[in-house]
């Protein structure tokens, strides 16, 4: 039987792609973990949409792209020359593809110009939750990204995509100013 654990991280370090170990609480593992959480949150969103739908395909692509992003984050700067665009390093084409999805979907409806109360539908609420997890991953990645890396712009566009998808899925928006208050 294959062991599914190594125990090598019991000392508080983690191994990186192409070699090397760093403390688990350092910038690279923290950012990689945040992106891993974002990928899982997007996966929950995928589980709520129709298989093979346009939304499912876009979310699947994002999950695939996040593996690339995590590979880049899990590589020491000395090994960045070993990374390959689109496979282990975020490429300009990956960022452009997400931008195209945002633009295409954004043209199909009038986006609200004010704050929206999340939760009109379960899927829209989950997309909003995934968006906030991606935003946190973006903040974590800022401190870990190499100069010139495209991973922060990718995460920024991905959060925009999730926002647009949530608004598209919910259809009718509940604007925060329209919520009745007792005061």
Task: Place the predicted regions along the sequence by residue.
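Phosphate/pyrophosphate-binding loop motifs in nucleotide- or prenyl diphosphate-using proteins
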Residues: 1-183
């Amino acid at each position: 039987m294959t062991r599914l654990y190594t125990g090598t991280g019991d000392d508080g370090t983690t191994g990186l792609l192409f070699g090397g170990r760093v403390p688990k609480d350092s910038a690279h593992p923290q950012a990689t973990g945040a992106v891993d959480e974002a990928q899982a949150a997007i996966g929950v969103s995928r589980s709520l949409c129709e298989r093979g739908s346009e939304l499912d395909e876009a979310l699947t692509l994002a999950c695939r792209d996040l593996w690339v992003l995590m590979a880049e984050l899990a590589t020491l700067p000395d090994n960045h020359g070993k990374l390959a665009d689109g496979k282990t390093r975020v490429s300009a084409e990956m960022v452009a593809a997400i931008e195209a999805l945002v633009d295409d979907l954004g043209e199909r409806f009038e986006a609200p110009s004010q704050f929206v109360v999340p939760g009109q539908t379960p899927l829209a609420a989950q997309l909003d939750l995934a968006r906030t997890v991606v935003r946190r991953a973006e903040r974590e990645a800022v401190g870990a990204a190499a100069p010139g890396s495209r991973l922060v712009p990718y995460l920024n566009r991905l959060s925009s995509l999730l926002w647009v998808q949530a608004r598209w899925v919910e259809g009718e928006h509940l604007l925060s100013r329209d919520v009745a208050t007792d005061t």
